Each structure stands twice: as C-alpha cells, then as structure tokens.
C-alpha cells in the first residue's frame, strides 16, 4: 500500500505522561468518592459527564476517551446519567483539576428519546433495564450548563456525536427551526467534533502544562468562539451565493511602505541572495467565512449553500477552517484531525477495558451492551457518503483499520475473559462491513479530493476494491480454537462487494446466520440520486452471487433489504413502485423507517430548504420534492407495509386519488384488495351516524343528506345530476367536505371532490406494473 501524505505532527502516544501516572490503572474508572478513595486519589484531573450508562467497552465513547486519557497519566472519573435537575450530582466527584468532558452519549439525545414522527420513546437501550427518561432533551446543552453552575471557572469541553453534528448553525427537526451552534447555547469553552482521541490528548497536555483554555485555539477537530480570525490566517468570503472572494488585509493608514526621508548617504551595493521558500498549499492557513447564523436562519438558500461548503471541507488533507458569525462573535471550526494510523488504532483498542458494565449496575441488563458484548470493531470511517448519514462528518471518509493481529488478540480476550461467551462472535465490522483496509491508492488524490462519495455515482478508479485483507481476517478468526462461528452483522456495501466476488463467496459460505442485511434504501432513481445510493442493478448482481454461493455451500440463506420512506426526492409514485417491487419479490417488512432529519446530514438540508446541496446552490437551482406532512409521511410508511390490513383504507384512497384504481383488487398485479362487503357496510353505517349540522336558525338541527344521494328537487323542477368519476368511497369523502346547504349544485360537488383529492399530497404519475412475482421465501425479521 502506498504511503499516505496525510500525516500527524506527532504520534498519539508520544507525549510525556502526566505525573499522576504513578497511580497506575484503575479497574474501572471511578464513579464515586468511595472508589476514588480506594484508588488513593484526592481529586480527578478530568471528569467525563455522559448520558449513557458506563460500560467499560471500546464500543462506548466514554470508555475509549477515559482509558485513552488514563493512558496519558491523567486521573479520569465518570459521572454517568446524572440527575440534571440541579447541580449537586455534577459535584459528586469534586472539582476536576483540568476540565469537564461532556457528551450526550453514543446517540444523539433527541434521536434516542423521540421517534421519526416526534413521538416519545418508552425505552433507552443505553440505560440499565432499558428505562427511558434517564437523560434530558438536548443533554449536551443541559449537562454543560450544570457543570458551569457547579464550578464556573472549570473549562467545559463538549464531545460526542450530538455536539459533533451541532457544531455549526443547524436545522433542528424537533423544534422545526434553525438553532445556533451548540457551543454558543451551552456556553462551553471548546467543542471537540468527530473521534476525539487526538485533540483531547493535545488539549489535556497543554492545560496540564499551564496554558489557559482561552489560549488553546488552533487544535484540529475543535471548535472555539472568537472575535477575529486566528493571526496569520487569510480568509475567503463565502457569505453570498456569488463567486467567493478573498478577504483582503486592512491597509495600514500610516503607509508603512512609503519611502522615508534620508540624507544622501551612500549605501554599498549588495548582491541579493535568492532563497525560494516552499510554496504553501492553497488550503493552508486559510479559512472560509460562512453566512452568519442570522442569515441562514432567515434564508433557506443560504442555509443550503452553507451546508454544501461544510461538506466540502471534511478531508483532513485539504480542509480549510470555517468561520461563522453568531451575534457579535464567531465560531471558529478548525480543520479535521489527522486520522489514526493502524499502530495508533491498535494501541487505542489494546487499552485495559474490562468489557463489562460498571459493577454499580449489578445484574440490571443494558440492551446496548448485550448487543455488542461479543462484537469487534475492526475499522472506522466511511466513504460511502450517503446523504441521510452523518458518519463522514463525524468519523471522516478515510478508513482507519486495525491490524489483523490486534483484532485476533481481541477475539482471544473475549473468548478467555468475557462471561457468557458461547463461541460465537456476533460481528466483525464497523460503519460498513467490507471497507476494512480499503483506501485510496493515490496519495495525492487522497490528500486533495473533495468528493462527497468515493463510490457514487461510480466507484472511483483510485479506490482499492481488493477484499483479500478482509477474507484473510475472516479465515484466521474462524480458525481460532474455541471459536464456533464468526457472524457479520454490519451492513455490507454491495456495490463494493460485487467488485470482488471472492468476498461474497466467503461471506455466504461461512459468515451468515440465515439472513444478511443490506440497505438498498429504495428502488427508484429519483430518491436514490438524492440519497447517493447505487441503483438496483448492483443489488440484483449481489443477490445473484449471494444465492449462487449459498446454494453451493448447501445453505438456505436470504437477504434482508432495508428501505427508507419519505426521504427527500421521493414522490408518491416512487413509493408505489417500491411497494410493487416488494410484493413482486415477496417481501413483507415488519419494521420500516421513515426518514429522520438528523443534524448536519445533506438529506436534512434537502428536507428543510427544498434545495439540493449535492450540486451548486442558488435561488434558481434544483428544487427537491419533500414529503413533509404527517399524512404523506404516514402514507409512504404504509406503502412499505402494503400487506398490513390496517393500512388498506389509506392505500385505497391514495391509489384512487392517483388514478391507480387498477392496483386495487384480487388480481396478482394488485397492491391491496378491494374492500369487503363488511367494510362497505361499515362505511355506509358511519355515514348514517355522522354528526348533525346546525342551520342558520339557532337551536334547530337536521341531518345532512347522504352525500351519495342527489339533493331533493323543488316542486316543478328536475333534480340536477352530479357527474363524478371517482369511486363511491372517494365521492363520499369529498362531498362530506362541502357545506351543509341541502341544495348543493353539481358544480360545487365536483369542486369539493377536486379539493379533497388535492389534500392527499399524491402525484398522478404512471406506475410500472410488475411482472410475475418470484417465489422466493425472503422475508423481514
């Protein structure tokens, strides 16, 4: 493999350990004063506040950060899921000598607490006994404020995925508004975004050396508040949609370049010596001035423009700093940190984790731990660039892989030490199962590329697609003594896998437990192009290879595809076509996911602005169709569960509105059955018992006439005929929305019908009819 041009200034473990190293390694990082006393500590140097239960396992952020800082010689305490209603629980371990580290946990607290439909969840997988309500909404903000109440002079550093994805002015789905950077609202001293090992270690050592937090402003992967740019940095003004321009230095009013008065003194002639300085890279010491918080809140196009810039500045090899005004100050976002090397990754995962929850939880189960206790993280990062996912903005595009030896040692440690191990490793993976050791083969391209995805619309020719390192790892792992099975539970990137069929054969032959999950997300080009996902051709090719190799291995195995409904760019006809594809392929999904607009994702920008940040943004640029209303989002979700009888009335109504009545019935190509006689009788019964209507005469009530009956004719006049081409069910619904006037005309009835159809939010576009369905046994878990 070629040597990367993206190199750190110093190794993660090259710092002189802090003096407290003499205390040694703690069995568990202390969560109480009693534990501190046992360790002989009079105080903590650093206290980590987290919204998750403390599990000493490398899949939990607080454990990695805590053990990493402990390895640098610092005394680290943890306050897990504190009582946030007052400051007292935040003073449990006393005042830290250096700083508080605040994180909401492994998940965004709002996503953890609410569903995609903004409904309150009643469980929390990161809490003992799966209890909900153990962390507040916007936990990062609340915890930070309580830390400042407890010890106002102690620096507060924000971290974790919640803070990371809120490092800039961002759209907040739950309040349906644009919020300021979380560092502003939390009144914190610094925000660490992404994986925090490198910046946290540097900041901790600089604070320990006596520097003030206000003087530490230039650390990569951090966000700070400033009134001016960093000294020596030049800026590019991108506050408007026109071509960005350089921010010129303010001229010296005293004219320092003007000639000075001199007496006629002869100066000896000297021959100049020319020394050519190294030409600086165009991104070095350069920042981009973004539209202010106030502007992006008021102008959706500027918001999309800002989002596009931020996503272009994620490559640590060439990213520029970003600067955005909030009121009378600016947030300063330093470029991303240099990724960890394989040796550094090995050292981080070799730290002395106990791999079990803290003893204070007793036997209370923690579902998130139960899910991962026998799994192993083999890499970080993802270059897929899916629009609805924020992994690139958090972990980066560059894959950071552990060595094979490091992974094998962890498997042996699980086998020998973790209670309850039965010989089955539940996962060898990461953000994606099959990106292990796959990096850009061109050092120059890796350093300078600003593409959002290395695999969309086509796989970059510089990208390595040789899966042999992964295959070798799988073979070595399953040959270990005491290991019965190695399963792969992480999602497989199938467009990469088809480039190396050997991997698919290895996977199907040895590492699938009956079902393999993959995520095509949709079948139609419209939404797929906005998601930046490959077309169904790659899926079909992968399925053919998977089925072939499964059959050769004598195994009955199935693919479980995952889909997203109501994603920006999805029209109703797209969801109907997806439902027909599911029916044709005999899939019946048990659980479906509506699009969830999480902070900083490109898809969230589309959802909020109606603009496409994947292309150049201006006031005339592409408008994106966004399914927003509750009714349309429910419809899209219902189409994924076309087989559920509870959804049939809604689907029938929508199909009629779209002019797709031919999809209602008992024929093979139909999506939903026609209403039964009992359902029709129930509908008529409901009409007869609707609420009475008041006339203009007070206290006099009368029933509306059934809407499918012509109004009574006046004496000597012929009753008007109502022309209505819709079905009886739709006509009934439409006519109920007309006024209570008993002499409603045919024109009024027709108008009401059109209005009712317009409220459904559906599109009257043609839908491809499916061919005869396959007889596979695929089904959803």
From Swiss-Prot:
SUPFAM superfamilies assigned: Radical SAM enzymes
Domain of life: Bacteria
Cofactor note: Binds 1 [4Fe-4S] cluster. The cluster is coordinated with 3 cysteines and an exchangeable S-adenosyl-L-methionine.
Sequence ranges of Polar residues compositional bias: 696-708
Pfam families hit by this protein: DUF3362, Radical_SAM, Radical_SAM_N
Radical SAM core domain span: 368-646
Composition skew (Low complexity), residue ranges: 726-750
InterPro entries in the record: Elp3/MiaA/NifB-like_rSAM, Methylthiotransferase_CS, rSAM, rSAM_horseshoe, UPF0313, UPF0313_C, UPF0313_N
Named cofactor requirement(s): [4Fe-4S] cluster
Residues reported to bind [4Fe-4S] cluster: 382, 386, 389
Annotated spans, Disordered: 681-781
UniProt keyword terms in alphabetical order: 4Fe-4S, Iron, Iron-sulfur, Metal-binding, S-adenosyl-L-methionine
A molecular function GO annotation: catalytic activity
HAMAP family recorded: UPF0313 (MF_01251)
Family statement: Belongs to the UPF0313 family.
Protein name: Putative UPF0313 protein YPO0674/y3502/YP_2990
Species per Swiss-Prot/TrEMBL record: Yersinia pestis
